């Protein structure tokens, strides 16, 4: 197997298309097909199947091999980075996974500062839900990811303590309170953001002796606030998610009592095994946000 063949396989897995993989790698479609055929012939296994409904799909074996091929390619990139560093150069690509709130809060400043200091390093941003970022880290699709609520499989660097608040209409009875307890919300219809936030919320209510009653599950903060404006429920949102977002008329926030924070953290599968480029990115993130 050649490095080019490995890159072709990864790109097909990411794009779900021979044509798009060829365009991304500046290769013809026959060359892409030949690269995959060569890998499958050498390994004597089927890696990719064509499904009428879902298009190109990885086989179970293909999914397992994808993780290891990504590790091989990252290892090759580390070798190139070490050689470049010896010459006084910084080269490489860093794949960063993040959810939308963190993208808006951290990425503009972080990317701007990083590109000024390391202009030859390429940053590729992958935006999804918290659960998708976790999956991308597990499959080594990304080098670093911004996450909430740590898991044992990753190593973490603290970025920010993000304060939570109750968001509700100004004519709701609880709006007269200066602070609201989770017990106060026990029987209230709650609008919950999906994608990795819901389970910690359920645990948070349970620990307070209350029960979370999701009335609606949404994926977007703007949707949540619009539904609150129409009197469809309340939400617990973070200050970071609402920063720079003026609340519409009749929508207000109230503090939680006791105050609740969520930890926003930079996650990597292994700090020791991270590439030189990824370590530079992590150090920059710590410099800019580590004290928050």
Swiss-Prot record:
Key words of the record: DNA-binding, Transcription, Transcription regulation
DNA-binding residues (ranges): 18-37
GO cellular component, one term: cytosol
CDD domains recorded: PBP2_LTTR_substrate (cd05466)
Record Pfam families: HTH_1 (PF00126), LysR_substrate (PF03466)
Single GO molecular function: sequence-specific DNA binding
Domain of life: Bacteria
Single GO biological process annotation from the record: regulation of DNA-templated transcription
Limits of the HTH lysR-type domain: 1-59
UniProt similarity note: Belongs to the LysR transcriptional regulatory family.
The protein, known as: Uncharacterized HTH-type transcriptional regulator YvbU
Name of the coding gene: yvbU
């Amino acid at each position: 197997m050649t490095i080019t063949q490995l890159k072709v396989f990864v790109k097909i897995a990411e794009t779900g298309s021979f044509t798009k993989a060829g365009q991304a790698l500046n290769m013809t479609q026959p060359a892409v097909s030949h690269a995959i055929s060569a890998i499958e012939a050498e390994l004597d296994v089927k890696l990719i199947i064509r499904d009428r409904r879902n298009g190109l799909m990885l086989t179970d074996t293909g999914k397992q091999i994808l993780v290891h091929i990504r590790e091989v390619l990252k290892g090759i990139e580390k070798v190139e980075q070490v050689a470049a560093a010896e010459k006084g150069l910084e080269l490489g690509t860093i794949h960063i996974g993040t959810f939308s709130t963190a993208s808006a809060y951290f990425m503009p400043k972080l990317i701007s500062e990083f590109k000024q200091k390391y202009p030859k390093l390429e940053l590729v941003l992958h935006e999804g839900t918290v659960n998708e970022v976790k999956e991308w880290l597990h499959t080594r699709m990304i080098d670093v990811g911004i996450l909430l609520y740590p898991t044992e499989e990753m190593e973490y660097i603290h970025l920010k303590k993000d304060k939570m608040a109750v968001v509700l209409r100004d004519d709701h009875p609880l709006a007269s309170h200066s602070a609201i307890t989770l017990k106060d919300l026990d029987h209230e219809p709650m609008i919950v953001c999906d994608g990795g936030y819901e389970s910690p919320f359920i645990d948070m209510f349970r620990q307070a002796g209350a029960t979370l009653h999701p009335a609606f599950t949404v994926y977007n903060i703007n949707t949540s606030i619009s539904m609150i404006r129409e009197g469809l429920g309340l939400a617990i949102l973070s200050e970071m998610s609402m920063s720079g977002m003026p609340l519409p008329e009749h929508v207000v926030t109230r503090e939680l009592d006791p105050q609740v924070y969520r930890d926003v953290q930079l996650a990597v599968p292994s700090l020791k095994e991270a590439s030189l480029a990824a370590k530079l990115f992590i150090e920059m993130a710590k410099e800019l946000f580590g004290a928050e």
